[in-house]
Amino acid sequence: MATVVFTVQSGRDPARVSSPVTGTVKDLSALGMSVVTPKIAPDGIHVMYDTLMTTRNRVDATVFVEGDPPVRVSGKVVWFRGADDPKGTYIFGMQFDQPTEEFEDGLDLK
């Protein structure tokens, strides 16, 4: 199991950054991850787009994999939807800016 703490940075106003949100990593590879989260728009900043859906927002995250040191990643969200479980949560897919060596072999997070 892996936990992630992430913030969302506005693409329109980069000085505007959300408060940290804790989520659960569902899938993880060197190129990206999917995250289950209770909030899709922390502090009113949507994980994917600004309010007009014209400018991409950015996500900065720290991934905590049990037994390993924390790993910082940055990137953009490429998809999102409501999650099936737990009820009332969301899931999003994040593409990293740079491949992450620590996750090169992927991880079994089940």
Give the predicted meaning of each segment:
Residues 1-110:
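Structured alpha-helical
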